[in-house]
Amino acid sequence: MSKPIVLSGVQPSGELSIGNYLGALRQWQQMQDDYDCQYCVVDLHAITVRQDPKALHEATLDALAICLAVGVDPKKSTLFVQSHVPEHAQLGWLLNCYTQMGELSRMTQFKDKSARYANDVNVGLFGYPVLMAADILLYGAHQVPVGSDQKQHLELARDIATRFNNIYSPENPIFTIPEPYIPTVNARVMSLQDATKKMSKSDDNRKNVITLLEDPKSIIKKINKAQTDTETPPRIAHDWDNKAGISNLMGLYSAATGMSFEEIEAKYQGVEMYGPFKKDVGEALVSMLEPIQAEYHRIREDRGYMNEVMRQGADKASARAAETLKKVYEVVGFVGRP
């Protein structure tokens, strides 16, 4: 019996955070035995916001090395760089022709990013969700791991796929309609200084973010200064409505140690101050990240191995993507290349 197909991507823009790890990359490693996984470093998506060429080049290699360091196995999964598979851009253009302007203008992420990058609101940023739809539909993905900020994009991908199928192949659909995959993760990884906001790798205030490759001393320092509250006496309790800062730290501690929230509350019952708890959270995060960092540095220095991973991944992805694109071109009426 064939495994369900999963597609997920990571952007090579900015340093990846522990939020990227706990919310996505750790699940990538865990899903490999039960799913047919297609994992992509989405450099085409990255340039919807202006990038320094040298920085993008290095960030793409960094992201690939991190994927390998967290346990993505190229023998189990297809790991590739998006721009190495031209079918993504080809199908993306075609799907533009089956997407309505009104649909794209309603995308909340476009509204947010266009406000942030007001001096560079380009067509690529507007059409970002269409390329994402192409990423998904090329591989017949049954499930797509998505966070709250990407749910709307997945819904659009479903709408585009359904529209195309109804026009050209209602009896024998070309595109699989993808479903969201909701990861089972305890941690809602929020900003360290304002736990009402999601931790973002692009946050201008670096005190809010812990990156995957962060120095251990810096991790400890940031956790020590993280938001808590002024409740007297101090109380370690998982309560997002009233204790967001503590709940955020509990989520990180749970993710790093495997302890439940109930176990954490019991362990720190009757604390006189938050300092010892923060110390334990920082040390747990360091212990979680140190082996990943060591493996990352080993892989990053082996460019020959990374080249081979990219080459094999692109070959595997292209073979599957080309099959889908051929079917699409045929039903649309394109003349095949002799």
From Swiss-Prot:
- What domain of life? Bacteria
Provide the coiled-coil residue spans. none
Q: Where in the cell is it found?
A: Cytoplasm
Q: Where is this motif: 'KMSKS' region?
A: 198-202
Q: Which residues bind ATP?
A: Q11, P12, S13, G19, N20, G147, S148, D149, V189, K198, M199, S200, K201, S202
Record-listed E.C. numbers? 6.1.1.2
Q: Which GO terms describe its cellular component?
A: cytosol
Primary location: cytoplasm
Tell me where the sequence motif 'HIGH' region sits in this chain: 12-20
Residues holding L-tryptophan: D135
Question: Which biological process annotations from GO are given for this protein?
Answer: tryptophanyl-tRNA aminoacylation
Q: Catalyses which reaction? A: tRNA(Trp) + L-tryptophan + ATP = L-tryptophyl-tRNA(Trp) + AMP + diphosphate + H(+)
Please list the GO terms describing molecular function: ATP binding; tryptophan-tRNA ligase activity
Query: What keyword terms does UniProt attach to this protein?
Result: Aminoacyl-tRNA synthetase, ATP-binding, Cytoplasm, Ligase, Nucleotide-binding, Protein biosynthesis
The job of this chain, per UniProt, is described as: Catalyzes the attachment of tryptophan to tRNA(Trp).
Summarize the subunit comment: Homodimer.
* NCBIfam families, per database record: trpS (TIGR00233)
Concerning PANTHER family, the annotation shows:
TRYPTOPHAN--TRNA LIGASE, MITOCHONDRIAL
Give the family this protein belongs to, as stated in its UniProt record: Belongs to the class-I aminoacyl-tRNA synthetase family.
Q: What name appears for this protein in its UniProt entry?
A: Tryptophan--tRNA ligase
What gene makes this protein?
trpS
